[in-house]
Curated annotation (Swiss-Prot):
Keywords: ATP-binding, Coenzyme A biosynthesis, Cytoplasm, Kinase, Nucleotide-binding, Potassium, Transferase. Its main location: cytoplasm. One of its GO terms (cellular component) is cytoplasm. The gene is coaX. It comes from Herminiimonas arsenicoxydans. This is Type III pantothenate kinase.
Amino acid sequence: MLLLVDAGNTRIKWVLVDCSSGQQTPGSWHVAGSAARAETAQLAQAWSSFSISRVLLSNVAGAELREELERAVLHAAGDIELEWFASTPAAGGVRNHYLNPAQLGSDRFAAAIGAHVLFPNRPLVVATCGTATTIDAVNADGAFVGGMILPGLALMASALANNTAQLPEVALHASSTQPFADNTDAAIVSGCLAAQAGAIERAVKAHAAAHPQGELYCILAGGAADLIAPHLSIAYKRVDNLVLIGLHTVAIHTLPTC
């Protein structure tokens, strides 16, 4: 079994791919799971019942989580080599045009790879809406152009509560559809949703202007995507597990038989 792990700031998502099933298709796996950041101890138990022969991980949540993941894999699979995915000048069919390719977050690069393998030969805007919202442009030929980073929906709302005297912490929900709210809680939600949707729409407009001959797809992913999606005035394609699809693509490119 091939274990793929997407360790983010809030949740750890993982899948297991059956390497004996012949030709691999990115995004097709045997079993999937997730755990909250504070629940990493449960991962070893979840993985222990499988025969894991290869592990590919993306971690953007720091050294402490990396050590916890190493311990979980050791407990579940023994002393096997861990492959830590990092951004390089090229991988999985995507070329990284960052000035310093290694500086690009591994999750953003993997998401771009996943989007490109799912929707090849067309320009893409990849919006991943999590703790942070990242909005990246990929050309039809697989060139990662660059992107935007802004606070995620929940982080944006909590920043108002934490840094102002009179604005409350609010529960984010999808029922706030009016742009001009008649109460403070709804006004915060409306403003944060408008900022997120507006950034995505601006990115799509800019990338589409650079590629007038190609049909651009906006790919929407991440835990807050379903809250933001109804407020977009543009067409989009909702995709789950984009980072894991990208990792699966890289694994296939480097060793097709796992």
